[in-house]
């Protein structure tokens, strides 16, 4: 049997695989904020990025290793393909962390070998031990992944895993890269590895999976029963295509059904010892932070963290819950940190009180960003009677942005009505503080604002998404606007919140423009990386 740490290790890949969601690109400060909250959540491993892919990814992994990795904190991990350049860049990026891991991978399915890598099985069996050993020359903790393991020949998979462990891999990851397997199949795959890999007792079995058929969480739970002891997942289940296995669903499934899972760990059924190290009361806070910073809206009926997860519409259900919550609720909302979100902050509240509450919500702002956030808070307090945590989160998420933003919105003014042509006047300042003003007409006030901003910026783009949602209840609620722009096939998202949705739209558009400019101004590929080498993309 594989190594058993006595519980399930949670490997969070929100900052790597999660960021591969179209339009979910994060800047360095946003990644750092999420990493700090993941540490508070109690995950065991943070996969902070793919260092060789770009200078930005390298810098983010290095900064997280410096500021989040600690003796008592999570392992900081970077992803690397099975090549020396990737592995060296990864080693350099994670070096500042007291607990470091290199996660290297290569595809093992015949379809990937033939059409993507153009390599034989023999080639792969030669590459794997060489690259794992090379990674071990930098760190003691090496994880090896067999990309597309779910569609690989099991007998070949056993050979590859044995070779990786012999070369020094302490964790072997089994990815269902395209979300193809069913729970029974995936469980049998893990059982087969346990039975047929001679040295499997020297490594922890990890699993990674995508949700293309909606089975990722079910597959993982079956894998746990079969001996997997590390789960690679993302907050809110974000990720490539249909997403990844959702961290919050996995953790709470094992929390609520602990009596069911305990025997698979050799424990008494009634053992109260948690199956993960995750602090469940941090789940809601983490979910909201990731949603705010990525602009990826959580569907209302999403398990555990959706807006309706603890709502009851049916009269029969409402009656039962009022009599005893256990009649229709298997999870106490307080267990995942969901409480009354009204807070005692108002227009008389001071800067220190706001800072303290923001830190509780997972935001550690610089002095300058805190000043900006506090000014926005005071402005909102003058216009809105009650301030909630959701309001604060919406305010501050706007502040966590590129410090070298090229454009800053100075003025937005619109004129519209049932018998008027919608017109917008906007003033934009560049990085040198020079201001320019433009006016445009449009089909509506938001269209007119966007036309004016494009006229001033002169950055080619296509608006592919405009969405607005209410942050809280009430007619004085803030409107949270998300805008996505497309250029050269890449998506750039921006969002903002304001009681005036037209102003929020203007701010969100400028935020997206700044991301677009930052994303196209410099090299997106690591200087050492030959474009032809990118035939093996990190989507395992």
UniProtKB/Swiss-Prot annotation:
Name of this protein: 2-isopropylmalate synthase
Database matches in Gene3D superfamilies: 1.10.238.260, 3.30.160.270, Aldolase class I (3.20.20.70)
GO molecular function annotation: 2-isopropylmalate synthase activity; acetyl-CoA C-acetyltransferase activity; manganese ion binding
Gene name linked to the record: leuA
Region (Regulatory domain): 408-540
Species of origin: Synechococcus sp. (strain CC9311)
One Pfam family from the record: HCS_D2
Family matches, as SUPFAM superfamilies: 2-isopropylmalate synthase LeuA, allosteric (dimerisation) domain, Aldolase
Cofactor(s), names only, from the UniProt record: Mn(2+)
